[in-house]
């Protein structure tokens, strides 16, 4: 077939057989939408039980199979060269699903949506395809794949990707307040990495090329985040640990926001309470502290720390290796005159060499700003600001005169 092939409204058939079809220059579409049975707003075909394409070797486009309620086995796609495969509302397709012999030619996606009986998906080690898994009730393991073009996961259930090492594009684990994701072998994400699930585990992850975002869907279990090996985030590190009553722990992290054009999950004004609050390239909300003992450089728009509503146990900010912040260094509590005041008492930056600007608010117990004396000569009255609601609010002239702490 020189271009695409489309078969719709085939409700009168039990079998669709194309025994000599070998190559298709575009897409193959089997789309059923005529029967009265509906799932998720889509009408289902309850007649077709079998689709045969046993001679198929190559599809230059995507194979679409949509809304066949009684289809139990796939056409012979394991071994085909194809751009993409999209399987939607095939509620009786039997487990397991094996694409280990399929060659994905690039630029497409492997989409599974509402596949109610599939528990295990097996893929080739090198798969030039974006894998999208959406609302599959039982799917709990994706095996075989070592490298993907991209990955999107919407629960579903808990899922593990035991062999996955590299994703060349974006990864999104989304809308999963009750589920966990495990990627025990993942080493590198070249695009963005979004975490919006209950638990996440990246024990071998060393680098994220774009932004790394962790939302407040993450569990209050202190072990719900594992970034023990992470060295570099090229874009924004956005971490909302509202529900994590433990320090943000990244013991090997050295640099954030240092890509040539850093990607941001959130940017611009974070001004719900303070009109001058912003999202930096290292934008953190933490109740219980930071463990960044090796962080050397923050590029892009700078380092911003939100201390929440004053409910934190965060008393000491120690960034012992931090040398450079290209943009702003900002700390704020979520709202002026909030009670109790943020408990932050000390800031330690023993090797700091460069900061673009300083802006600190809402820290009623903070009375010593000596950490900034090594860089005060780089600043001026416009780039130095400490709000009067802090325990001590030295002006730029105070700092220039060496009056960095409350007497």
Regions picked out by a protein language model, each given a short descriptive name:
Residues 348-407:
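Leucine-rich solenoid repeat scaffolds
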Residues 325-349:
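Intrinsically disordered, low-complexity segments enriched in Gly and acidic/Ser/Thr residues
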Residues 1-7:
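Short, small-residue-biased leader/transition segments that mark boundaries at the very start
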Residues 7, 158-160, 224-226, 281-283, ...:
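Sequence contexts marking disulfide-bonded cysteines in secreted/extracellular proteins
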Residues 13-22, 47-57, 70-80, 93-104, ...:
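Short, T/G/N/S-enriched strand-turn elements that build extracellular solenoid repeat scaffolds
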Residues 31-43, 257-279, 333-339:
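Acidic/polar low-complexity surface segments
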């Amino acid at each position: 077939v020189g271009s695409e092939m489309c078969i719709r409204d085939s409700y009168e058939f039990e079998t669709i057989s194309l025994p000599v079809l070998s190559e298709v220059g575009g897409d193959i579409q089997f789309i059923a939408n005529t029967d009265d049975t509906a799932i998720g707003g889509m009408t289902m075909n309850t007649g077709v039980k079998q689709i045969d394409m046993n001679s198929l070797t190559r599809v230059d486009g995507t194979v679409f199979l949509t809304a066949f309620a009684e289809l139990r086995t796939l056409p012979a796609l394991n071994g085909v060269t194809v751009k993409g495969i999209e399987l939607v509302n095939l509620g009786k397709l039997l487990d397991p699903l094996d694409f280990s012999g399929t060659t994905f030619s690039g630029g497409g996606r492997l989409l599974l949506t509402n596949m109610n009986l599939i528990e295990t998906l097996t893929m080739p080690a090198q798969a030039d395809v974006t894998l999208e898994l959406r609302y599959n009730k039982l799917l709990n393991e994706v095996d075989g794949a070592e490298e993907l073009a991209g990955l999107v996961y919407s629960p579903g259930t808990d899922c593990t990707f035991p062999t996955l090492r590299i994703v060349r594009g974006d990864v999104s684990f989304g809308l999963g307040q009750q589920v966990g994701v495990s990627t025990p072998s993942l080493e590198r994400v070249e695009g963005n990495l979004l975490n919006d699930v209950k638990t996440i585990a990246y024990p071998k992850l060393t680098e994220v090329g774009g932004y790394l975002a962790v939302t407040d869907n993450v569990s209050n279990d202190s072990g719900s985040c594992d970034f023990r090996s992470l060295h570099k985030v090229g874009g924004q590190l956005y971490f909302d640990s509202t529900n994590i009553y433990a320090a943000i722990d990244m013991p090997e992290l050295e640099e954030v926001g240092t890509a040539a054009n850093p990607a941001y999950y959130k940017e611009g004004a974070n001004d719900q309470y303070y009109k001058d609050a912003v999202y930096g390239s290292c934008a953190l909300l933490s109740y219980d502290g930071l463990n960044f003992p090796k962080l050397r450089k923050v590029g892009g728009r700078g380092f911003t720390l939100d201390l929440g509503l004053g409910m934190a146990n965060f008393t000491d900010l120690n960034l012992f290796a931090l040398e450079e912040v290209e943009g702003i260094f900002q700390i704020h509590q979520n709202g002026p005159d909030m009670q109790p005041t943020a408990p932050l008492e000390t800031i330690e930056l023993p090797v700091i060499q460069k900061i673009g600007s300083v802006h600190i608010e809402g820290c009623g117990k903070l009375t010593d700003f000596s950490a900034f004396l090594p860089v005060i000569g780089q600043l001026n009255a416009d780039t130095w600001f400490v709000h009067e609601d802090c325990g001590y609010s030295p002006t730029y002239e105070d700092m220039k005169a060496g009056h960095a702490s409350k007497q």
